[in-house]
Amino acid sequence: MERGLGTVAAVSDLGRRHHRNEDSFSVGNTALPDGTPAVVAVVCDGVSSSSRPHEASEAAALAAASFLLAALPRGMGGEQAMHEAVLVAAEAVNQLADAEREPGRNAPACTLVSAIAAGGQLTVGWIGDSRAYWVPLDRAGAARLTEDDSWAAQMVAAGLLTEAEAMADHRAHAITAWLGADAQDVEPHTATFQPDRPGVVVVCTDGLWNYAEGADQMARLVPDGSRSTPLPSAQRLVKHALDAGGHDNVTVALIPFPPPPSAQGRKGDA
């Protein structure tokens, strides 16, 4: 599954070890009230231990993107819009729960990561361990924009393990926050950045970042010319994950920053 709008692109692949793709994405263009282009990408990863994880990720991605594409033109600020979008996505996933149909099973659940590029700013929002990275055109100062909700991240934050030690543990990828009816109170993470140079935002599931965890590693993978060719570049990133083993579903969205003028006034999602 792939989608290219020129100003943003996303690709999702089954991987080599799974019989079903439980990832989903939604991307789109709109404009702020003053006509400034705004670009949105949402990527979700269904929790495999839950029931119907593919439905959860699809519902969350579509709900969050639809909210953002409607809220930004009305003048809602980026962080507020992102916060509300994650909550809207959470409610969409909650509505999938059906205890009578699936007794004893975990309710549908997924992670979510989203990015908005507009007005010289990048705003990201997330729940779970799907990630966003900033990769400048010159590759200098690449950065991870999100912090995982995971066992590994908790161990590192507590000073109990180094990142390398935590990631080597079999519990590393156990997530500590997600969207779903059996989740604790959902507290969306949001952050806003003001890059001082052009580049691209990489929004992805762990099916990609498992093979490029560090920001510098991710920066080396991003093809030259990604700002002008986001779809072929996203395809190459997915191919890298597949060539490296493809142990999971893999989904990546690329947003060129700043958004080109062609984003102005156009809308789209998938």
Each language-model region and where it sits:
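PP2C/PPM-type serine/threonine phosphatase catalytic domain
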Residues: 1-270
